[in-house]
């Protein structure tokens, strides 16, 4: 077995074990203290279960997508040193086109409008 296969097997096994333990441990002893909200050692002043803004979530996801896009396209100037620079340019153009189409769709659907 080569090194990469061993690392992948260890990663998958460790992930499965940790996911199983994380779902299993909280169910052992649920009590009122574990289920109550915690605000820096003080009793909560209001409702601790406030609704979360879906628009804020969508804008945060868009920010993460475009931040990831920058991270993926940052090494693009060094892509011309590869064996097929045209293929590198084509893939980066495809990524940019896909993200641009997604942004246009989100804009036309009104997902970027903060106030209605």
From Swiss-Prot:
Q: Name the keywords, alphabetized.
A: Electron transport, Membrane, Mitochondrion, NAD, Respiratory chain, Translocase, Transmembrane, Transmembrane helix, Transport, Ubiquinone
Q: What's its membrane topology?
A: Multi-pass membrane protein
Q: What does this protein do?
A: Core subunit of the mitochondrial membrane respiratory chain NADH dehydrogenase (Complex I) that is believed to belong to the minimal assembly required for catalysis. Complex I functions in the transfer of electrons from NADH to the respiratory chain. The immediate electron acceptor for the enzyme is believed to be ubiquinone.
The family note in this entry says: Belongs to the complex I subunit 3 family.
Recorded catalytic reaction(s): these are: a ubiquinone + NADH + 5 H(+)(in) = a ubiquinol + NAD(+) + 4 H(+)(out)
Q: Name one GO molecular function term.
A: NADH dehydrogenase (ubiquinone) activity
Query: Highest taxon of the source?
Result: Eukaryota
Give the EC number(s) under which this enzyme is classified: 7.1.1.2
Q: What is this protein called?
A: NADH-ubiquinone oxidoreductase chain 3
Q: Which organism is it from?
A: Salmo trutta
Sorted alphabetically, the Gene Ontology cellular component annotations on this record are:
mitochondrial membrane; NADH dehydrogenase complex
Where does it live in the cell? Mitochondrion membrane
Report TM segments. 3-23, 56-76, 85-105
Signal sequence region: none
Q: Does the keyword Transmembrane helix apply?
A: yes
Q: What class of enzyme is it?
A: translocase
Read off the InterPro entries from this record: NADH_UbQ/plastoQ_OxRdtase_su3, NDAH_ubi_oxred_su3_sf
């Amino acid at each position: 077995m080569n090194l990469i296969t061993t690392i992948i097997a260890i990663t998958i096994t460790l992930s499965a074990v940790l996911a199983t333990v994380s779902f299993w441990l909280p169910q052992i002893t649920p009590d009122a203290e574990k289920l109550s909200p915690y605000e820096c050692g003080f009793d909560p002043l209001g409702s601790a279960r406030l609704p979360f803004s879906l628009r804020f979530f969508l804008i945060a996801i868009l920010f993460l997508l475009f931040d990831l896009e920058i991270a993926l396209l940052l090494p693009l100037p060094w892509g011309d040193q590869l064996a097929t620079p045209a293929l590198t340019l084509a893939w980066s153009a495809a990524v940019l086109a896909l993200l641009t189409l997604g942004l246009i769709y989100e804009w036309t659907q009104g997902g970027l409008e903060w106030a209605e």
